[in-house]
């Protein structure tokens, strides 16, 4: 949840209008709304490889395509979807960020079978209509905000992993101080001392 809040919240912070920031950021921070960033289409380490499209038609966008692995996608109320509005996959220009309510008709949300606790989902979009007012930042220029948000997300993910490892280490040390084998604390065994 933390990395999802940081990723999505950062995208809103970097690209959102003042109204979007004032409305959404307090809801995200308070936990009132759960939000997820949807940009991965299977090229996990290349965020410019976006091929999901959003064609502007009047005052709406028509969204089609899919997202392969969306962290916290199963529990999200709202998505920030990175889409191609111009150019070709691989270009940094032509990427836009759109806010999408999870209950919008035409969106399919499926659980993915990854061994992780992050509620990964696969999203499929079939002619999903999104109001033009749900554009984050400027049309075709969403990559700069996306890139900054991903940088913050990487730092957050590293902090989460470090915290988890520290907890495992602390519990292991505690166990070594409490568990006895052959009438002796196992923490006194030389082989286990080498590992801690």
Give the location of each predicted region:
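Buried hydrophobic positions in well-ordered alpha/beta secondary-structure cores of metabolic enzymes
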Residues: 17, 37, 63-65, 81, ...
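A structural signal for short hydrophobic beta-strand segments in well-ordered beta-sheet cores
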Residues: 52-55
